[in-house]
Amino acid sequence: MKTGYFNSSVIKPLVKASAQHAAFVTGDIVFDWTGFEIPRGTAKLLGATIKIRSKGDSGSTVQPAGVNLLFAKGPVPDATPTSLGTANGEVTNFASTDIIGAMPSAAADSFGLRTLYQSTVSSSELVLEPNGNSGANIGVDKFYVAGLAAGALDFRSAVTVDGTPGTGQANLDVEDLDPDLFMVVGDVVHDEDDRLMGTISVFTDANNVVMAANLANAGVNDKLIYNINPIEIILHFQK
């Protein structure tokens, strides 16, 4: 039988701004179950490329560790597994029967000034076997991935809202740090209270971030802002 290889689409899990507002410690939940689809049928997970943004400080401090991945399938097709617990806290639901495997981070495989991790699966060779009829479309199966801190991850931001920019404008006035040091066009920005500001369209300068549309919520002076997708994952499979 012919062997095939393929990659998942880019997975951008939600890392809540309120969870990024404090540093993580080893074992903390970085992001809860996030769904992804792959071509229908059983597949072997060979590895993952995990891109992790730097800390939001003046030095763009590189993250000192990676993320351990857990995999699950829903209790019934297309049903999200039970939450692992509160983000930036310990797992409280390790007993879930939905979990089907794990892939530890390989810290020695890290490289790049913005921290790019290339991790390989353990010798157990994780195989993802789907529920029947999962996935939103014919020909695909749905699984879920969650991430636990493999060390002292720290996404804390030093960028604050300047004044009280209103919802009648697309410009978010900021101060204290140039957001361009750790944010990019296309990032979805929330404030520290998990209030949506918008999706970045352009950086006019170090104090002005223009969103793709008017601000979703009015800014609150001195509130810190965060990119809610500081981690991107591409999974590598064999069929």
Model segments located where?
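C-terminal interaction-tip segments
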Residues: 1-21, 133-159, 226-239
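Extracellular and analogous surface-interaction loops
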Residues: 31-42, 131-136, 175-179
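A short beta-strand element within beta-rich, extracytoplasmic domains
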Residues: 43-55
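Extended, low-complexity, turn-rich repeat/linker tracts enriched in Gly/Pro/Ser/Thr and Asp/Glu
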Residues: 52-63, 151-156
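Short coil-to-beta strand junction motifs in C2/discoidin
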Residues: 60-67, 228-230
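Short edge-strand/loop segments of extracellular domains
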Residues: 66-80
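Extended, solvent-exposed segments with strong compositional bias
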Residues: 89-135
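Autoprocessing Asn-cyclization modules and mimics
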Residues: 156-222, 226
